[in-house]
C-alpha cells in the first residue's frame, strides 16, 4: 500500500515537473511582450507556481491516504493558493521595499518579465508612456532609474491594487 501511494505521489510530482517546464517555456517565449493578455499570464502562473502548490497538496493528500474527493479538493486548493501567491508576489515586486520583501524589489522588471501589475499599468498608460515601456520592457534598455519610474507608473495606475484584488478572489 505504501509503495503504491509512493509511486502515485512520484507520478504526481513527475507530471508537475512537466507542466512547470512547459510553463517556463511559455513564459520565456512571451518575455518582454507588452501585448501578453491576462488569460495567458494566468496560464503561465498556473503552470508554474500554482502547479507546484497543487502537486504538493495532492501528493501530501495521497501520502496521507486521503480519499479521492479530499485529494481533488486539496489539489484545487493548492492551485488556487498558488495563483493567489504568485499574483501577490508579482504585486509586491513593485509595491514593497527590498527590506520588506527579503529580496530585491524590481527583479521582474529588470528581467523583462511581463507580470500582471506591469501589463495593467501598460494598458492604463498606453498613449503617454508607450515609448518608456517599449524601451524598458520590449527592448530591455533600462537605466538604474527606470525601475523607480516604472514603480511610480504601476502604483499610480492602480495596477498593484487590481492585482491584489484578483489575488484575493483565488483565496
Spans of features found by a protein language model:
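All-alpha prenyltransferase/terpene-synthase fold signal
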Residues: 1-169
Amino acid at each position: 500500500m505504501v509503495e503504491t501511494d509512493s509511486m502515485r505521489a512520484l507520478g504526481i510530482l513527475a507530471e508537475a515537473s512537466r507542466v512547470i517546464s512547459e510553463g517556463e517555456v511559455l513564459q520565456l517565449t512571451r518575455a518582454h511582450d507588452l501585448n501578453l493578455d491576462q488569460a495567458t499570464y494566468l496560464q503561465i502562473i498556473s503552470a508554474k507556481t500554482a502547479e507546484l502548490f497543487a502537486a504538493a497538496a495532492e501528493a501530501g493528500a495521497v501520502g496521507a491516504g486521503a480519499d479521492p474527493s479530499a485529494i481533488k479538493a486539496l489539489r484545487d486548493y493548492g492551485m488556487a493558493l498558488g495563483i493567489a501567491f504568485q499574483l501577490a508576489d508579482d504585486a509586491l515586486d513593485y509595491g514593497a521595499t527590498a527590506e520588506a520583501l527579503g529580496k530585491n524589489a524590481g527583479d521582474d522588471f529588470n528581467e523583462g518579465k511581463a507580470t500582471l501589475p506591469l501589463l495593467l499599468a501598460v494598458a492604463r498608460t498606453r498613449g503617454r508612456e508607450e515609448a518608456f515601456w517599449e524601451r524598458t520592457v520590449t527592448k530591455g534598455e533600462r537605466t538604474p532609474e527606470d525601475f523607480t519610474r516604472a514603480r511610480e507608473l504601476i502604483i499610480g495606475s492602480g495596477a498593484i491594487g487590481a492585482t491584489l484584488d484578483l489575488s484575493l478572489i483565488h483565496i
